[in-house]
Amino acid sequence: MAAKDVLFGSDARERMLRGVDILANAVKVTLGPKGRNVVIEKSFGAPRTTKDGVSVAKEIELADKFENMGAQMLREVASKTNDVAGDGTTTATVLAQSIVREGMKSVAAGMNPMDLKRGIDKAVAIVMDDIKASSTPVKDSSEVAQVGTISANGASDIGEMIAKAMDKVGKEGVITVEEAKSLETELDVVEGMQFDRGYLSPYFITDADKMQVEMEEPYILLFEKKLTSLQPMLPILEAVVQSSRPLLIIAEDVEGEALATLVVNKLRGGLKIAAVKAPGFGDRRKAMLEDLAILTGGQVISEDLGIKLETVTLDMLGSAKRVNITKDDTTIVDGVGDKAQIEARVTQIRRQSEETTSDYDREKLQERLAKLAGGVAVIKVGGATEIEVKEKKDRVDDALNATRAAVEEGIVPGGGVALLKASAKLAGLEGDNADQTQGIAIVARALQSPIRQIATNSGVEGSIVVGKVMENPSATFGFNAQTEEYGDMLAFGVIDPAKVVRTALQDAASVASLLITTEAAVADAPKEEGAGGGMPDMGGMGGMGGMGGMM
């Protein structure tokens, strides 16, 4: 086992604090509407420019092991906030730095770190309750747009685009962000249920220009096994032909004779038909077929349920207003399923997604939920250069997460005002002893740090801003750094999601408390390099002097 370096007490804390400061100082320049960019070197390709706090934090690795420990613990704050709320990472970093600095001063002055931690926890709990109580639900899409705009650092076009996407697909819908190849940023909305399986044969195509199959009011047969022969299906095919409506077959696979027969019938014009593979694999395929059955008002034809293909009747088939199939995707628009059954299925999937511990499963369940409940919107981020597109995509991701958080838990005044005003709740609050009271004071002071940093980044003296905002009794009065005006933050449209503010404080206090209560730090000792190791002794080459005679 490698030898270790161990530092104790103030030596350990000071070295870790240095790392905390390096990381926090790099991250906090990005805070607020007038925050600056950070340029990050990449081992390949062009450097990356970003204003996203967590992207900066993740890139920082320090040479000194003890400083790096401090920096990594602070990085954990940004990562955790990003995972839970998706935004507010810079705010969380600024809060954590302030709590750590003030806390370490108190420890150096001889106070008990554990009591300081208890005081900090007490204060944080009160502030969290205050933020929850003062948050207001998001009323309309203009507020969604404002939240998005603030998170995208004042880019109103991004805010409006996210609001439009949420209008289209609803709160349950999935909104994804992709890099576009063009200069413009655009919104693409897929209505209905779409899954990534295309037609099994190009002979099914009905629109040769667009290379896709279009079906109006088709019957939909959902079969969970492979179709190798059409013999068992003849009765249902006869019934469909007589109804003169198209038929879409969704099965595990359609192969060999079955596919050939379908294609021949399609080409002869007797049967309007198309076949696609069922989406997903294994158990997930069964679940998605069940979703499709509920959406289209049909039944999954499954041997497990004792239903054979020979006995299928028209009322077991699903139906939809329209189906579009390209070579990669199938989209079912306006399935005729029963609304109450769809609602029940949505509730069931939502419960599964809340209970699952696997992130992958949760993501897949969310996708299924969106396809059933709303739809899918894609924001395609464009720009002149790759660097610009990546930087903009970071901001769109943040804005999207912030708007989701706002819809979930409501909004509070932005610009650091909600935290600053909450600090008034801590005035006069006392702990069980003087050290706990000091812990409460540390949090009260830290709550000023976000608004101070926003002011500093816009070239205004932070303490003057804090003084002016605190003088005004209104809970929504603050400083708009974009225009450098004082007034009602909600009227200015400067709002933050309550969840983001709450998570930032919670995570900052949690990691900062750990740093304050650290009494020893252990790291790998630097390896001793042997002097000039590796090269053989060259003393034997002295004889080369004799080569003079060869010239």
UniProtKB/Swiss-Prot annotation:
InterPro entries: Chaperonin_Cpn60_CS, Cpn60/GroEL, Cpn60/GroEL/TCP-1, GroEL-like_apical_dom_sf, GROEL-like_equatorial_sf, TCP-1-like_intermed_sf. It is found in: Cytoplasm. The gene is groEL. It catalyses: ATP + H2O + a folded polypeptide = ADP + phosphate + an unfolded polypeptide. This is Chaperonin GroEL. HAMAP family: CH60. GO terms for molecular function: ATP binding; ATP-dependent protein folding chaperone; isomerase activity; unfolded protein binding. NCBIfam families: GroEL (TIGR02348), PRK00013.1 (NF000592), PRK12849.1 (NF009487), PRK12850.1 (NF009488), PRK12851.1 (NF009489). Coiled coil: none annotated. GO terms for biological process: protein refolding. ATP binds at T30, L31, G32, P33, K51, D87, G88, T89, T90, T91, G415, D496.
